[in-house]
Amino acid sequence: MSRDNQEIKAPEESSAEEQKEMDDKVTSPEKAEEIKLKSRYPNIGPKPGGSDFLRKRLQKGQKYFDSGDYNMAKAKMKNKQLPTAAPDKTEVTGDHIPTPQDLPQRKPSLVASKLAG
């Protein structure tokens, strides 16, 4: 039986070796073509710092994801330029729960309501 096992293993090994040789034959012409192309065109290929387009975009400075980001940044710049308001207002927001006595009186509307008729 041991002879049978050895005989069975031998064809498997030879088929694996044949498969490797076939793979080498298939890839070797491809690799040969790659070597030829690289020798003809040495500048073409993956660059370590990424593509030229990406490098150019990164050098330009801060860019915005969309128009919302642009408008938010623009609003922040305007807020920095505006002078701050004087602290004469003493409105309290969120410190306590308002009661009807705490609320200021409602001002009458300048426009007459169509419903009041």
Swiss-Prot record:
The modification Phosphoserine is found at residues 28, 67, 109. Its main location: cytoplasm. Transmembrane segments: none annotated. The lineage of its organism: Eukaryota, Metazoa, Chordata, Craniata, Vertebrata. Belongs to the endosulfine family. GO terms for biological process: cell division; G2/M transition of mitotic cell cycle; mitotic cell cycle. The modification Phosphothreonine is found at residue 99. InterPro entries: Endosulphine. Protein phosphatase inhibitor that specifically inhibits protein phosphatase 2A (PP2A) during mitosis. When phosphorylated at Ser-67 during mitosis, specifically interacts with ppp2r2d (PR55-delta) and inhibits its activity, leading to inactivation of PP2A, an essential condition to keep cyclin-B1-CDK1 activity high during M phase. Interacts (when phosphorylated at Ser-67) with ppp2r2d. Phosphorylation at Ser-67 by gwl during mitosis is essential for interaction with ppp2r2d (PR55-delta) and subsequent inactivation of PP2A. GO terms for cellular component: cytoplasm. Residues 1-54, 77-117 are annotated as: Disordered. The gene is arpp19-b. This is cAMP-regulated phosphoprotein 19-B. It is found in: Cytoplasm. Residues 1-37 have a biased composition (Basic and acidic residues). GO terms for molecular function: phosphatase inhibitor activity; protein phosphatase 2A binding; protein phosphatase inhibitor activity; protein phosphatase regulator activity. Keywords: Cell cycle, Cell division, Cytoplasm, Mitosis, Phosphoprotein, Protein phosphatase inhibitor.
